Curated annotation (Swiss-Prot):
It comes from Renibacterium salmoninarum (strain ATCC 33209 / DSM 20767 / JCM 11484 / NBRC 15589 / NCIMB 2235). PANTHER family: 60 KDA HEAT SHOCK PROTEIN, MITOCHONDRIAL. The keyword Chaperone applies. This is Chaperonin GroEL 2. GO terms for biological process: protein refolding. Together with its co-chaperonin GroES, plays an essential role in assisting protein folding. The GroEL-GroES system forms a nano-cage that allows encapsulation of the non-native substrate proteins and provides a physical environment optimized to promote and accelerate protein folding. One of its GO terms (molecular function) is ATP binding. Forms a cylinder of 14 subunits composed of two heptameric rings stacked back-to-back. Interacts with the co-chaperonin GroES.
Length: 538
């Protein structure tokens, strides 16, 4: 396949244009007065959202060079979403500002490598200051963090209640409700850190997860490689017309191939995952899952082999969600008495053990068995509203978890503007020379852009707001919802510091790559067959 190459300024301008087009679509959603973006879907109703990463994922540009820039900006949003679960719009706006300011300096003759070094040192200084300004989350602030992310005080209260019930490490899942009411339901369930063995098992491609409703559960202690030993049970499962969830030491070879083929042909909705843990701990965790789901572990140790067992060894659960990293089982069919017995047994083991490591692992297993799962059932009048609301609640869950992990800073873009004061005080920043000093001022201007767009989207003069906020004490800033200045933390306008730091670092990482790019290589578009025969007489 022939390639096209673009060099120097032309290459960097194309990247900038691509970053701009994506960022301009995303930044209109920033802040409490941000607008929505409507995404066309090939089938079904369009999606209305204000979630940066959801918008970014949909964008592909015609121009192959510009598209490279858009994909880099998309990477900023995706990476921030993976680490912090929110802050994707802020990250995109920061990346756009750093790229724009940086390329202006490169065009004026600044050395890209010096700018890159200056950006990295400056960003670390600001990230460090953000950590210094962090406050721990107090009781009522959980609702504030969630409410800001979801743009709804009611959802904020609901999530505060959910985290209160399941704890900061507890599992919260989001489901669609058949009614118009959004409610919290506490249920028995478990999550463990193993994902699907093949992406072919995915049922929801937008969210890259496999969801099984009312599924049968096979728990096998050993490997499943041969289809022969597995076939009798597979045929019985097919007759039961229910989805099948398999947990085993591993599933590979022809067994995995057969499952994938049946899944792709639509014969059987199936997902396979590796068993969590190692050695004796793995056996114990499989037994925990078996008790929770009413299954029996298939193991030669107790005289059971795959080719001899029937549906009676399978457990069931109302819903199982599997991502590439995690599995969540909700409402297993195990009896309350069996689960309570297992919990008592684990507590007794916990009291007997002296090993810190064993204690930690037993605590984890206890939390999984006894902690339960908070299920938020999302209700809305239409399917379009339901999807939009679900996106907001997902963001809010991630944001709240991030706040509970690392603490909070003032929201509304103010924390970044005030943390930029570190650029005047940090020893490493002061030691910079030449074009690296230019990068310091470039970063100072760039970190003010989220505040600018939050203000502009609310109908205020962004640059005027920036100059006022820069003079206010830490923790004070501009509340775009009311249009007033004040103590943002007291007013509940707060952001998780993890979200703000991740957004800044990821934006700087991509901006540094763009500034030091000298050539772009893309595939040459194929000529249309009808064009190549144009003018020929037949």
């Amino acid at each position: 396949m022939a390639k096209q190459i673009e060099f120097n300024d032309a290459a960097r301008k194309s990247l900038e244009a691509g970053v701009d087009r994506l960022a301009n679509a995303v930044k209109v959603t920033l802040g409490p007065r941000g607008r929505n973006v409507v995404l066309d879907k090939k089938w079904g109703a369009p999606t209305i959202t204000n979630d940066g990463v959801t918008i970014a994922r949909e964008i592909e540009l015609d121009d192959p060079y510009e598209n490279l820039g858009a994909q880099l900006a998309k990477e900023v949003a995706t990476k921030t979403n993976d680490v912090a679960g929110d802050g994707t719009t802020t990250a995109t706006v920061l990346a756009q500002a750093l790229v724009k300011e940086g390329l202006r300096n490169v065009a004026a003759g600044a050395a890209p490598s010096a700018l890159k070094h200056g950006i990295e040192v400056s960003v670390e200084a600001i990230a460090g200051r953000l950590l210094e300004n962090t406050r721990e989350v107090a009781g009522g602030q959980v609702a504030s963090v969630a409410a800001i992310s979801a743009q709804s005080p009611e959802i904020g209260e609901l999530l505060a209640e959910a985290f209160d019930k399941v704890g900061k490490d507890g599992v919260i899942t989001i489901e669609e409700s058949s009614s118009m009411v959004t409610e919290l339901v506490l249920t028995e369930g478990m999550q463990f850190d193993k994902g699907y063995l093949s992406p072919h098992f995915v049922t929801d491609h937008e969210r890259q997860e496999a969801v099984l409703e009312d599924a049968l559960i096979l728990i096998n202690q050993g490997k499943i490689s041969s289809i022969q030993e597995f076939l009798p049970l597979l045929e019985k499962t097919l007759k039961a017309s229910k989805p099948l969830f398999i947990i085993a030491e591993d599933v590979d070879g022809e067994a995995l191939s057969t499952l994938i083929v049946n899944r792709l042909r639509g014969n059987l909705n199936v997902v396979a995952v590796k068993a969590p843990g190692f050695g004796d701990r793995r056996k114990a965790m499989l037994q925990d899952i078996a008790i929770l789901t009413g299954a029996q572990v298939v193991s030669p140790e107790i005289g059971l082999s795959l080719d001899q067992v029937g549906l009676e060894v399978l457990g069931t659960a109302r819903r199982i969600t599997v991502t590439k990293d995690n599995t969540t089982i909700v409402d297993g069919a195990g009896t309350d008495a069996d689960v309570a017995d297992r919990v008592s047994q684990l507590r007794a083991e916990l009291e007997r053990t002296d090993s810190d490591w064993d204690k930690e692992k037993l605590q984890e297993r206890l939390a999984k068995l006894a902690g339960g799962i908070g299920v938020i059932k999302v209700g809305a009048a239409t399917e379009v509203e339901l999807k939009e609301k679900k996106h907001r609640i997902e963001d809010a869950v991630s944001s709240t978890r991030a706040a509970l992990e690392e603490g909070i800073v003032a929201g509304g873009g103010s924390a970044l503007v005030q943390a930029a004061k570190a650029l005047d005080e940090n020893a490493e920043v002061k030691a910079l020379e030449g074009d690296a000093v230019t990068a310091v001022n470039l970063v100072r201007r760039a970190v003010a852009q989220p505040l600018r767009w939050i203000a502009e989207n609310a109908g205020h003069d962004g640059y005027l707001v920036i100059s006022k906020v820069a003079e206010l004490p830490d923790g004070h800033g501009f509340n775009a919802a009311t249009g007033e200045y004040g103590d943002l933390i007291a007013q509940g306008v707060i952001d998780p510091v993890k979200v703000t730091r991740s957004a800044l670092r990821n934006a700087a990482s991509i901006a540094a790559l763009v500034l030091t790019t000298e050539a772009l290589v893309v595939e040459k578009p194929e000529e249309d067959e009808s064009d190549s025969h144009a003018g020929h007489q037949h």
